[in-house]
């Protein structure tokens, strides 16, 4: 409690606005980093390995795989489970469903990033405002002094001016850097989701894309033989 009062004295009128910006930055970064950790627990290789052990023409295997993926927390698993749950629909309808789902995920990934960027812009301005207010207080102290001007007369005003500037920059740097890094992560994750869902959609049609960009097509006769 004493440290909070000390910070209020050091930051002056800009203390609570800077406290609020700092708290919002910490909460948004923590929530976004938690989302990042959830998405880092699975790769496309795990999805492909599971699909290789399943026939796209076997409804029972598809239902089991859908249930298995739906029980997982990573967003990539949930996206594949959503697509597998619509395996009985035409390819175009599955693409529409995947497009809607991807839009929702993009909105979720980018939520809070604009607010982080806004905090990164506002915080230095709040610090600058605190600097101006601190200088005003300093000049008031100088004007009220009848004798010689000593460093003690200037200390309070200059202290508020410097502290608010430093606090604003300390909040702005992680806010802006975090917003930019999380935006890059969101774009990379969305590209990964789109690629995986396209792969699964082709797999449901009996086509498999290999690492060398070649396609393997499973004909209905081959699928029937495999199921038997």
UniProtKB/Swiss-Prot annotation:
Q: What is its main location?
A: membrane
- Cellular component terms per the entry's GO annotation: plasma membrane
Q: Which Gene Ontology BP terms does the record give?
A: protein import
Superkingdom as given in the UniProt entry: Bacteria
InterPro entries linked to this entry: ExbB/TolQ_transport (IPR050790), MotA_ExbB_proton_chnl (IPR002898)
Question: Which compartment or compartments is the protein found in?
Answer: Cell inner membrane
One Pfam family matching this protein: MotA_ExbB
The similarity comment for this entry is: Belongs to the ExbB/TolQ family.
Provide the function of this protein: Involved in the TonB-dependent energy-dependent transport of various receptor-bound substrates. Protects ExbD from proteolytic degradation and functionally stabilizes TonB.
Instruction: List the protein's name.
Output: Biopolymer transport protein exbB1
Q: Which organism is it from?
A: Vibrio cholerae serotype O1 (strain ATCC 39315 / El Tor Inaba N16961)
